[in-house]
């Protein structure tokens, strides 16, 4: 019986959305967005992250000004309880995603490990 891999992926999507970790992340994100100060700080933090990632991906040097802004914004978000909670929930979801990725990659790892013998 052939397996539709995309159906499995959609089932995984639904399953992830039902995990306690995702539901907690969703609640934490809602709380940040309901607080104007936290929302503004979090958006600024994400903007700085994107700027740094874009510079890294294009091989641009990250200048002192960008580093200083990143440090300033990081300090601000670390002082905001709602954002800290959100980041903790993001870390829990990241762990799950990494575990799932490891499982998904197992067939390829097994294939290449067998062919190396």
Swiss-Prot record:
Superkingdom of the source species: Bacteria
Pfam families registered for this protein in UniProt: Com_YlbF
InterPro entries on file: Com_YlbF (IPR010368), YheA/YmcA-like_dom_sf (IPR023378)
Entry coiled-coil feature ranges: none
Protein family per UniProt: Belongs to the UPF0342 family.
Protein name as catalogued: UPF0342 protein lwe2240
Organism: Listeria welshimeri serovar 6b (strain ATCC 35897 / DSM 20650 / CCUG 15529 / CIP 8149 / NCTC 11857 / SLCC 5334 / V8)
Lineage of producing organism: Bacteria, Bacillati, Bacillota, Bacilli, Bacillales
């Amino acid at each position: 019986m052939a397996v539709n891999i995309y159906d499995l992926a959609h089932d995984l999507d639904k399953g992830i959305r039902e995990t306690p970790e995702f539901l907690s992340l969703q609640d934490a994100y809602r709380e940040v967005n309901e607080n104007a100060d936290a929302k503004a700080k979090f958006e600024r933090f994400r903007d700085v992250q994107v700027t740094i990632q874009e510079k890294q991906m294009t091989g641009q040097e990250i200048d002192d000004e960008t580093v200083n802004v990143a440090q300033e914004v990081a300090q601000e978000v670390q002082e905001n309880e709602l954002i800290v909670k959100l980041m903790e929930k993001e870390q829990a979801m990241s762990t799950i995603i990494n575990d799932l990725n490891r499982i998904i990659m197992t067939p390829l790892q097994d294939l290449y490990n067998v062919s190396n013998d």
